[in-house]
Design a protein with these regions (language model features):
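Active-site and ligand/interface coordination hotspots across diverse enzymes
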Residues: 1-85, 101
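Long, contiguous hydrophobic alpha-helical segments, chiefly transmembrane helices and signal peptides
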Residues: 76, 114-115, 157
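Internal alpha/beta domain cores that form substrate/cofactor-binding pockets in large enzymes
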Residues: 41-43, 83-149
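Alpha-helical hinge/cap motifs
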Residues: 150-157
């Protein structure tokens, strides 16, 4: 499937989703060029955004380095680096210095497919009953989104 077709289908999917969810937080492939160049295609599958009654566009957020909620995204950066450089021996302090560079940090974050199962935000702790109910209600849309991108992605829960 071409990039243009994926983007078109993604827009239609999120338009449909917005009819059901007022504060929908869109996600997906952050940057197609960076994603297509990455050695391993990674899909980061998370529960929900930490954003109550707020719309967070994760493509914008991650394309700009994800400087809000820094501890979460620094862990993600470590995972990405480790997965993309699995054959390399590296020193932990070198990795920390590497991601202090804004350009490198942003490039790594742009290389992923990011998907929250619950497309509306919650607090820093998930209400499991609410999460489960919404995932059941949105099951078909979640499956449609994953099928839109899925090829040989590695899914990291």
């Amino acid at each position: 499937m071409t990039i243009d077709l994926i983007l078109e289908k993604e827009l239609k999917l999120f338009d449909k989703w917005k009819q059901q969810r007022e504060f929908l937080c869109p996600d997906g492939i952050i940057n197609f060029e960076s994603y297509s160049k990455s050695k391993v295609k990674i899909m980061l599958l998370l529960k929900e955004a930490n954003a109550v009654n707020e719309i967070v566009d994760f493509k914008d957020f991650l394309n700009n380095g994800a400087y809000d909620r820094k501890p979460t995204w620094e862990n993600v950066l470590r995972w990405l680096y480790g997965i993309q450089n699995i054959d390399t021996d590296y020193n932990w302090s070198e990795i920390e210095k590497l991601f202090a560079d804004e350009k490198i940090r942003t490039e790594y974050l742009k290389s992923i497919l990011f998907c929250n199962l619950k497309k509306i935000g919650g607090t820093y702790t998930t209400n499991n009953f609410d999460f489960y109910d919404i995932c059941i209600q949105d099951k078909e849309l979640i499956i449609e989104q994953i099928n839109l991108y899925f090829d040989n992605s590695l899914i990291c829960p």
